[in-house]
Every structure is written in C-alpha cells, then in structure tokens.
Amino acid sequence: MLFSLRRLKKLANLEAFSDQKVIDSLINLGFEVDQITKLNEISGIKFGQILEIRKNPEADNLWICKVQFADKIREIQTTAKNVIENKQVLAFIPGSKSGNTTFLAKKLRGHISEGMLISAAELGFNKHLLNSELDQGVLVFDPIFDLESNPLKVLELDDLILDIKLLWNRPDGNSYLVLANELAAFFKTDFSLINKEITGKFYSELKIINKTDSKIFALEIQKLPKLALVDIFLLLKSEVKIDNLAQNFANFILIYTGQPCYCLQLEKNQQKVELIEQKVKIKYEPDAISSYHFLDQEKKPLLIPEFSDQIIMENNSFFLIMPKFNLLKVKQIKQFLKKNSLKLTQLGKNYNYGTTFIALSFLNFFLEDQKIDFSWPINFDKSLISKKTFLDLNYNELKEILGLELSQEDISKTNLILEKIGYNFDNTSFSPPFYRVDIEFFADYAADFLRFYGLEKLKDCKLEQVKAKIPNPDFEPVKLKTLGYYETNSFLLISKKEDFNPLELKSQDLLTFPSQEHTKIRYSLAWQLAKITKYNQKRKITEINLYEKGSIAGWNHSLALASTIYTSEDLKKHLKILYNYDFDFLPADSEFLNPEKSQFIYLDNVLVGWLGQVVEKYNYENVTFLEILLSKVEKIPKKEGGKIKFRPYDNSQLKYRDITLSLPMKDIPDPYLKVIQKIPEIFSVKLINYVIINNQQKITYRITGPDQVCAEIDKFYK
C-alpha cells in the first residue's frame, strides 16, 4: 500500500523528526519500504484569490485573471475555462520552480502574465485518477485558506510516497491509524485517534436481515461528509481514483482504518435491508457469478458490492455498511471481475472485528469534527473485541528466542511501549492488541518485543564460533527403497470433514486457505497414503508399497508406510531396520482403527505411532499402515549398547523350539514375545503359523538358538 510520509508524521506527532529517521524506524519496525517516491519537484507556489476575470482581446482562448496574493495583486493568463471570481487557486509566481523550470513574468499576446495557475496533474498526481471536476482545467476551490500560508505545507504537497509491503498476516497494517500508532509508540509521542469507546447521537431503526455467512455492521449518518482538499490529495497519493462524494468518503475510511465500506441509502419509509447471495452477470461476460446483494423491502437490489454502487443524495441520511465477507467468495469475485482495487484487495484479507472497531472509533472523531450526527453502531457490540486471548509469559524463553541478555528494566520499558499499541500485561500472561490476527504464539510476542526493543541491539551480541560439522548421511530413503517402498508427496492441507486422527493430535484451522478442500493441517500422513493407494487401485495396480515423510498437525514430523503386500509383522521388522529402538506394541483403542488388527506404538511409555488397519467404514481393509512420529522419537535418548565381548567360536549346530500362544482375539503376542526375547543368545524368532480356532488366536513361533536357548525354553515351559 502507498502511504504519505507527511500524513504519517502528522498523525504520529513526528514533525520534529527527519524524514529519513521516520523511514528508518518503519524499516526497524519490520515494514518493508519497497520504494520511496517524491510527489513533485515544486517550490515557491502560492495561494491566490481571483478578483476579476476578463478575456484577452488579442487571443481566442486566453483569460486574464487578476489574482490577490499575500504580497500583491498579479495578473496571470490562463486557457482554463473553469476559473471563477472569488474562488481560490494555486499559482506559480515569478521565482517559483517546477523541476528545472523557473517561472518568470512573460508577455503573452500583448499582456504580461506574472506566473501560471496550477492544475492537479502539475502537482504530481496521476491524471487518470482525477474526476471531471479536478481534470477540467486548473485547481479552483472555496476561499478557505490563508493567503499567507504555504500551500506545500497546508496541502501536504512537499511529500514522499512510501510503497510499504505488508506481511499477509498483518491486514491491520493497511491503515494510516495503525502505522501511525506504531510510529508514535516507537518514538514515544502522543497518539489518541484509536479510542477505546464508541458512541452515537441516536439509535438507528435499521434492521439488517443477513442470509449469508458474512458479518455486516453499519452506521447511520445524517449527512454525507465532503472531504477536504488535502484528504482528496491523500486518496490520490494512495492511487485511489477520485469519484463522487460517497465513494471518496468510503475510500478515505478504508485507507485510514483498513475497513472496507459501502454507502447505502433508503427511502424514508423503509427501515429494513436484506443481504443475500445471488447470481449476477456483467456485460461481455458469458458466465454469471454468485455475489452479495443488498435488497430493499420490495426485494429490489439497492447495492451489489463491487458490481454496482448506489447514488447517494448529498444532504440525506445514509448508511455506511462495514462488511466482513467470506474470503473465498471475495477471491472468486476478484478473479471474475479481473479487478485489483484497494477495497477488493482488503476485503480478501483476514482482518478482524478490531479493524471495524477502529473504523467506528475514528468515525466518532471525524463526524463530530464535521458536526454531523450519527447513530450508535448497528449490529456491532464491544464484546466482539473484549474476548481476549491470554498467552503465558516466560521471560527466560524470551531471552532464549532473541538470544539477548535482558534486564528486568529492559523488559518493563519495552512492555510499556507495547501497551501503547494495545498489549495488556499481568504478572504471568499477556493479551495481544484487539485488532491483530497474527499474535497466536509466544514467539509472535517475542518478535513484536524485538521490533520495539530495537533490532540494532542485536549488533551487540557476540556470535559463538560454530565448528564445521559434516552431517551424518541419511540412509532411510535407501533402506526404504531396498524394502520395496516408493516415495510420495501429498497435500499438507485437508478439508474440515476429514477427521481421521488416531493419535488425537490438535490441528489448526487456517484463517485464509486456497479452497474448501484445503482448510486445515492434516492429522495423519497415513490418511494421505490411503487416498493415494485407493487412486492407484482404481488404476488396477494391486501391489503397492508407499512411504512419505512430512509435517502433520501439532508441529509434528512423521513417517508413514502403506502396503497391500506386507503384513503388520513385516512392517514391525521394517521399523526395526529403519530405527533401532526397542518399541512396544499394545492393542489400539481408537474409533479410527480396527481393534483386532491394529496396535499403538510406544517408546519408553510415550505414544509415538500406530500400526495396522483402519475401520471398515473407510474401505481400506486390504491396506496395512504404519505411522511413527519422528519428532517424538528423536526427543527420547537412545540407550547405549553394552560393551562388545568376543567368545570362542562355537561350531555346534543351532536348534529350535516351536511354541504356540493361545490368545483372545483382541490380544497381541508382543508382550509375551518380549519375555521370550530376554533369553540370551537367541538367533531368531520367526512366525510359522497363525490360525483362529473357537474365537481364539493360535500363533506359532519358531525360536532358533544354541543348546542353552532351547534349555531355557524347556525350563520355562516345565
């Protein structure tokens, strides 16, 4: 978004600071100032008031204007036909400059012209953004300015335009008030335009019947405000096209507060508006699109946002509509219209009710200053922003995250600054500013703390010397390929209706998302492999072994295997090959898993994964899965192996014993095998038979080893 540096300095009371210092502070606050452009190269212009207009008798299209300036009366010739007596103008007088041009008195068609009257385009504004009133000749306005004053200061024309790139999660930053508030906090100056209270002069009788999933707030205003010339110039600096009074007012509220607005007017006997979604077509487009319609009591459209605006009568009351539309719907409308306006862009961002509150608070101030009555907010209640989310404070963690030695005084001073932008602190917790959507974790607070504590303080930190280290090679892909698995990559995001979550992880619903099929972070990689397996089975591929490593919910890193060939016992062996840990397998009690064919995987009594098959309703009964949370496994220290002892070579023949376990259907053999595997010098334990007789599992294993192993087994069974 484009910002006027002059207006930011004015709002934040920073006139005493240099332009460069303020720009540097914006960068230190984390705002990317992508480009700095000077509005114009003008100096020496003056306010003047037209006293008399007469035609130059020696020219067809020249008018001689007698203009009163602060120092004297001058005659200036112009071709503009919109000059009016007793109106004020801006003028280059002798000695004024525009770039490399210096203006002098000059004889034109027999008469001296002591300068030149100024148009909006000559002030540095984009001609294509001007309406007919501003583009019909020279600038002409009511006589409200002191002729002694400097137009460059009064109209904020000696300005730098800052192109500031904001992060996607800072929609509140598309606002003069929010940026000015942060600057004022940074420089410790006064700022009072974001109040904590909103009022009204009367209660509106308007009823909004909302039949959509959007939120709609409104304010009834008794008269349409007319923006001052300096505020019209502010819109032009933001590359907003100048339109009628209603559009200009709505756009002004947008750039000041970040809240998109629309103006709506009703007949005197109507007090009800209905909001629906309905198809709309535009000229030269073959397709229609569903969009928002505001209807009157007779179901006639009053306003179709972004498609058709209502003409607002200047001296009649109207309603300022402040919507929070469905983000996906806005994205569809934006693509359909191939439009990239400031308002439509902001509508597509996830601003919260705090932005609406800032708009209402500013409107209180602005309308009172204009002496225009307004209602209490319609549909908006302060409770929408008073529900605060509190996060735990941990200053040791803060120091660790930032890598700084912070004193209690450093922390207290910085927190006082943060309170100016809306933070609330108590002894053990804090709540973020009511208008921010990006403060979800303690690390987000730490980032804000550093912005106001000072990024330059990081220079004082001495970096520790880090010795170069050659990373250990990752043999997992080679092992998995050797075992016959093929790697896959799936979407990180799933739809809301996909609830497969055997490990009961917590996911995050995204505030913005690409589609309804991708709205939250997946709970399980195995679930993604299941969908890929089914897709390949439909293509008549029956022998499938797949694996994937990736992120899942709760900041976990996971490995998942899926196979139509291998059994659960095979997957256990593969897990042992990949990670030489002593895993425990216990019966799985989960609504998502087949209790007779599934087990949870534990390591040191910590649940780290699952193995087996899913319940029948998912229709994946011929697929065996294994999923392990690598992020949990890596946190558990690996047990050191004992010292290696060499023994004399024994050339005697190995022997074996077959043992059969008789278990209930829901039981698993692993706990019993663990007892047997404690016998020293076992060479192998191999499954040789599995049958079900009278609802009992009969599982036969062959244990192979030297004489002493067989002796221990015989002793155990006797």
Curated annotation (Swiss-Prot):
Binds 2 magnesium ions per tetramer. Gene3D superfamilies: 3.30.56.10, Bira Bifunctional Protein, Domain 2, Nucleic acid-binding proteins. It catalyses: tRNA(Phe) + L-phenylalanine + ATP = L-phenylalanyl-tRNA(Phe) + AMP + diphosphate + H(+). Residues 39-153 form the tRNA-binding domain. GO terms for molecular function: ATP binding; magnesium ion binding; phenylalanine-tRNA ligase activity; tRNA binding. It is found in: Cytoplasm. Pfam families: B5, tRNA_bind, tRNA_synthFbeta. InterPro entries: aa-tRNA-synth_II/BPL/LPL, DNA-bd_dom_put_sf, NA-bd_OB-fold, Phe-tRNA-ligase_IIc_bsu_bact, PheRS_beta_core, tRNA-bd_dom, tRNA_bind_bactPheRS, tRNA_synthase_B5-dom. Its cofactor is Mg(2+). Residues 386-460 form the B5 domain. GO terms for biological process: phenylalanyl-tRNA aminoacylation. Tetramer of two alpha and two beta subunits. This is Phenylalanine--tRNA ligase beta subunit. The gene is pheT.
